From Swiss-Prot:
Cellular-component GO terms for this entry: plasma membrane
Organism encoding this protein: Mannheimia haemolytica
Protein name: Biopolymer transport protein ExbB
NCBIfam families: exbB2
Superkingdom field: Bacteria
Family statement drawn from the similarity comment of this UniProt entry: Belongs to the ExbB/TolQ family.
GO biological process: protein import; transmembrane transport
Gene name as annotated: exbB
Keyword annotations: Cell inner membrane, Cell membrane, Membrane, Protein transport, Transmembrane, Transmembrane helix, Transport
PANTHER family linked to this entry: BIOPOLYMER TRANSPORT PROTEIN EXBB, PROTEIN TOLQ
Pfam families per the UniProt record, alphabetical: MotA_ExbB
Membrane topology: Multi-pass membrane protein
Amino acid sequence: MEQLFQFLEHHTDFVILGLLGLLSVICLWKAIERIMFYSKVDISKYDTLEELDIDLTHNLTTISTIGSNAPYIGLLGTVVGILLTFYHLGQSGGDIDAASIMVNLSLALKATAVGILVAIIAMVFYNGFGRKVEENKLKWLALQSKKPHQAV
């Protein structure tokens, strides 16, 4: 058990913050791809609304998933940090140092803060892109209503 706590103490920040950093890079990469796609999409080349919808919503699930799960990853880091704080408190033999406890708890909470930050950014992108999807679908429908109907 001692080895587990030593491992957690030395690697939790790197793993949790590294994972959140990776997720933020993936989110930014997908967001840049979507921005480039939306700026160049030609809705008139699509024959059906379904085909347009598939292309418009590509990568949005990834961005949404990052936005929904980043706080939980941060919370996991906080839980591990609090667990380590209690472990060290128990190992101290009842010698309570309030300053040390507060420092450890504040460091544990940084993981949640980073997770929330990643989630906020991802959800801002997701909601903005959701609006772009709706706009382009409505433009496509308006374009279709202006086309002369062909007899089948």
